[in-house]
């Protein structure tokens, strides 16, 4: 929890402020979750401070909240094309993604217990805090603007699929799913794109794609096949209903 608060302060997510008389502060809470791999095994326990977005008032502190995500058709199409082209297939994670996007609206939040010296204080958000209704949309717009800045264009069939064209050829495809990026393309192009994004965002290269959008991804590069399964999802459903 202390690491989470330190990271938020480091990134300048908020500034202490007085609550205007005509406004209500959005509450915050701690959310604890387990991160699992493609087999459903727990790999990390995380604690995150989030805003109680359900208390935000439409037209006062939120005006737009829709954030598109790629459909399963995008996943299947990209993987099939990757196998056919024998391209690299990578998984990148944007660290503390939402707080890298600016908050355009005036949002005031009250920090809950567990925030150290900040507990109980009213702050104004400068960055997009997890849990606020527009935060996902803000980060999506930031991600797309960065990709367009380095030469990508959105595909007409799905705005969550972006392509980089060089000399009339598609050399890289990226499908962002919230803070996860599925990246495929020619090796030199993928390496160049990685460095360009790292100059603008904090990203972690997770290596070859093996788990994405809740699906386990298995590749046989020699046979040029890619298989997707939902092992982790099935395990979670069985655990939830006590049928393990």
Where are these regions (language model features)?
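Long, low-complexity, charge-biased intrinsically disordered regions
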Residues: 1-244
């Amino acid at each position: 929890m202390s690491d989470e608060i330190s990271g938020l302060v480091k990134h300048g997510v908020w500034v202490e402020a007085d609550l205007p008389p005509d406004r209500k502060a959005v509450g915050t809470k701690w959310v604890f979750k387990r991160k699992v791999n493609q087999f459903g095994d727990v790999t990390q326990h995380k604690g995150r401070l989030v805003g109680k977005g359900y208390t935000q008032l439409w037209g006062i502190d939120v005006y737009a909240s829709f954030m598109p995500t790629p459909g399963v058709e995008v996943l299947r199409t990209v993987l099939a094309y990757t196998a056919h082209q024998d391209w690299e297939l990578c998984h990148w994670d944007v660290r503390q993604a939402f707080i890298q996007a600016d908050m355009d609206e005036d949002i005031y939040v009250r920090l809950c217990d567990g925030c150290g010296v900040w507990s109980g204080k009213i702050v104004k958000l400068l960055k997009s805090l997890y849990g606020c209704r527009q935060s996902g949309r803000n980060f999506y717009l930031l991600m797309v603007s960065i990709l367009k800045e380095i030469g990508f264009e959105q595909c007409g069939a799905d705005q969550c699929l972006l392509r980089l064209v060089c000399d009339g050829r598609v050399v890289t495809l990226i499908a962002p799913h919230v803070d996860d990026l599925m990246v495929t393309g020619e090796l030199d192009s993928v390496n160049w794109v990685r460095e360009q994004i790292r100059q603008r965002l904090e990203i972690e290269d997770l290596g070859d794609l093996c788990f994405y959008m809740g699906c386990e991804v298995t590749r046989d590069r020699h046979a040029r096949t890619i298989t997707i399964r939902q092992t982790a999802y099935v395990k979670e459903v069985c655990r939830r209903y006590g049928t393990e």
